[in-house]
Amino acid sequence: MAFKGVLNDADVTAALDGCKSAFDHKAFFKACGLAAKSADDIKKAFAIIDQDKSGFIEEDELKLFLQNFCAGARALSDAETKAFLKAGDSDGDGKIGVDEFAAMVKH
């Protein structure tokens, strides 16, 4: 698992189970334990999710967000992806930077 040492496997499994039918980023971050983690751990999570290492999480990476936690997890729907991007993209540039991600995880 990519998040070994950052998140508890059982918490991640429970969080993934909770979003099989609908994705709510706030509920997911809380359930998987990321919301309670340190700034350094949140940056580590960001680096894992930023698949192309661009320094940003773009829409295509958000669509596959859950698969970072478990390879067999579902892709987010287009509507879920757009809502997730809108929630995290505070400066309106169409992508989520590390500071935006940290703010989204914590709130």
Swiss-Prot record:
Residues annotated to bind Ca(2+) 2: D89, D91, D93, K95, E100
Annotated GO MF terms: calcium ion binding
Record keywords, A-Z: Allergen, Calcium, Metal-binding, Muscle protein, Repeat
All residue ranges annotated as the EF-hand domain in the record: 37-72, 76-107
Tissue note: Expressed in both white and dark muscles (at protein level). About five times lower expression in the dark muscle than in the white muscle (at protein level).
UniProt superkingdom: Eukaryota
Keyword Transcription attributed: no
Residues given in the record as Ca(2+) 1 binding sites: D50, D52, S54, F56, E58, E61
InterPro entries per UniProt: EF-hand-dom_pair, EF_Hand_1_Ca_BS, EF_hand_dom, Parvalbumin
Signal peptide: none
The protein's role, per its UniProt record: In muscle, parvalbumin is thought to be involved in relaxation after contraction. It binds two calcium ions.
Family: Belongs to the parvalbumin family.
Protein name per the record: Parvalbumin beta
Native species: Trachurus japonicus (Japanese jack mackerel)
Lineage summary: Eukaryota, Metazoa, Chordata, Craniata, Vertebrata
